[in-house]
């Protein structure tokens, strides 16, 4: 590649990728790990998972972490975001620590650092320990106490070496999946519980931040949010209002309390009007107010487009946020034909400028961005390399908009692709591939670097393209 970079990034920019414990570790029932909701749900309803592939069959990072981390180094990573499996470290959610799990995470952290890769560590990535789900999960306030204890345990065990912590990844997703739209366990449709889950998750984040600061570990702590911009169909006031309400439900519900310490008035007004306020006390709001994040991870894949409701909602149907807006399919939109998602690269710029203008230009980074492709094997050449030019194009076009945001003063510090190697995408299992590295499940998880991985190495090494 000729090194006439048109897009130069700061020399200390964080280049890397992100992943989560349940999606890549494998070894779901080994070495003392307790069950989480994914292990349990797969056992109960394997037919709901693509090709009946469950969390025990994921990408075997548990056994191959040394080789995988060496590969990260080869692909130019200076940082990598992982998560700790709560039910691996503390099998029942509370109580005894699993020493083998502590050893594993210590080894992974040490190996990353030895390879010049800074570990970014997230505490919760959709994987509630089953023992806690049995008492209600995030609906039950006791889970908040258990989570704070888990967070303190992680800080104590790993905080000497880990200086970038995150309390949650996409906390709105377990709310949507578990309590509104039936794509996570416990598969309920119950808006009252959804609100309680959201509130307790937010409180748990603030309490972990408070604990981290009490422990004086001289790092930074934040949260990772999927900030999908809500674009209205038109400038008609009804469409604009639909966009603002969707934004309050899905973005500002966690963004505002995480960065500003308070919930958006538009959302609170709707919850009061509809009779869905959560149980809480004044001290909870004070803890949320005082314990805002140092650093924000931004996950961005696709925009959300909405319009004013076309029809009156069925009064007997369960209450869902969609009572206030309809999805809008914009004619002529650019699509990822392999995944059914819209590609709108400017969305990442819009998020960063919004954070700059309305959220104090908080220090942030792109913590996930990526392109899932079904049937990626058809792009493998004679040498066995997947020629994923579509992924290179996708990353490049997003990086151009991130670069523009930096030129305009955005405090964005890095870019992590989802994900390093193909991983298990929850109920979609291995249907859509996202990695820089392909994983062949038929050949014992054999790793092969894709064309995009080689390209990314060049970009990271030159901090630009």
From Swiss-Prot:
Keywords of the record: Carbohydrate metabolism, Glycosidase, Hydrolase, Polysaccharide degradation
Gene3D superfamilies the record matches: Glycosidases (3.20.20.80)
Domain of life: Bacteria
Any GO molecular function: beta-glucosidase activity
GO cellular component: cytosol
Pfam families, A to Z: Glyco_hydro_1
Example GO BP: carbohydrate catabolic process
Induction profile: Up-regulated by konjac glucomannan and by cellobiose and mannobiose, the possible degradation products of glucomannan. Repressed by glucose via the carbon catabolite repression system. Also repressed by GmuR. Is not induced by aryl-beta-D-glucosides such as arbutin or salicin.
Active site positions, chain numbering: 170 (proton donor), 368 (nucleophile)
InterPro entries: Glyco_hydro_1, Glyco_hydro_1_AS, Glycoside_hydrolase_SF
Family the UniProt entry places it in: Belongs to the glycosyl hydrolase 1 family.
Functional description taken from the UniProt entry: Phospho-beta-D-glucosidase that seems to be involved in the degradation of glucomannan. Is also capable of hydrolyzing aryl-phospho-beta-D-glucosides, although very weakly, and plays only a minor role, if any, in the degradation of these substrates in vivo.
Name of the protein described by the UniProt record: 6-phospho-beta-glucosidase GmuD
Gene source species: Bacillus subtilis (strain 168)
The encoding gene: gmuD
